[in-house]
Design a protein with these regions (language model features):
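N-terminal targeting signals for export/organelle localization
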Residues: 1-43, 172
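Short active-site neighborhood of thiol/selenol oxidoreductases, capturing the structured segment around
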Residues: 51-70
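Structural microenvironment flanking redox-active thiols in thiol-disulfide oxidoreductases
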Residues: 73-113, 123-130
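Thiol/disulfide oxidoreductase modules built on the thioredoxin-like
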Residues: 108-116, 123-167
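Short loop/turn microsegments at loop-to-beta-strand junctions
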Residues: 37-38, 60, 137-138
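Active-site acidic short loop of glycosyltransferases
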Residues: 56-58, 88, 116
Length: 172
């Protein structure tokens, strides 16, 4: 017995429904399974090691930036204000200068602006690689107390939304 065209008519819609449901499930689980922050140790401009262990249990902002990046320089006062607003609640902040940024420029910038948070040099580019091959600056990560990445901002963050996220994370 051969199948007639009408008896196979249900196969394509059923297959499409199964594929759509599968794609939806994958999207749901991937969006709800946050990635862990990389286990990388930063080295500050003062030679201090900033280890993953020292950041555990804290809400952390990791900001990849460069002194040659106008958006980075423009957002830095707002980053300072954000840090100052939430540091008493336990916010940690690491500003990571990109590998192409001359260390003396970074040190000069941090000292003349009196940046109140840790400033690290990514001389080898390993930190940028570990955080998903960061190439665009600024790129900012918000990491929860559980060590999971809560949000990644490309470009200057929406600061009111960032502040809401920080408040929620610092309370939790």
């Amino acid at each position: 017995m051969t199948a007639t065209p009408s008896s196979k008519a249900w196969i394509k819609p059923a297959l499409a429904a199964v594929l759509i449901a599968g794609a939806g499930a994958v999207a749901y689980f991937s969006l709800n399974q946050r990635a862990s922050a990389p286990e990388i140790t930063f080295v500050s401009i003062k030679g201090e090691k900033i280890s993953p262990e020292s950041l555990r249990g804290k809400v952390v902002m990791v900001n990849f930036w460069a002194t040659s990046c106008t958006t980075c320089v423009g957002e830095m006062p707002k980053m300072v204000d954000t840090y100052n607003k939430y540091k008493a609640q336990g916010l940690e902040f690491v500003a990571v200068a990109m590998s192409y940024d001359p260390p003396n420029y970074v040190v000069n910038y941090a000292e003349t602006r009196q940046l109140p948070f840790k400033v690290a040099l990514d001389v080898t580019g390993d930190a940028a690689k570990a955080y998903g091959n960061v190439a665009m600056t600024p790129t900012t990560f918000v990491i929860g107390k559980d060590g999971k990445i809560l949000k990644r901002y490309l470009g200057e963050p929406d600061f009111p939304a960032l502040h809401k996220l920080l408040e929620k994370s610092l309370q939790g």
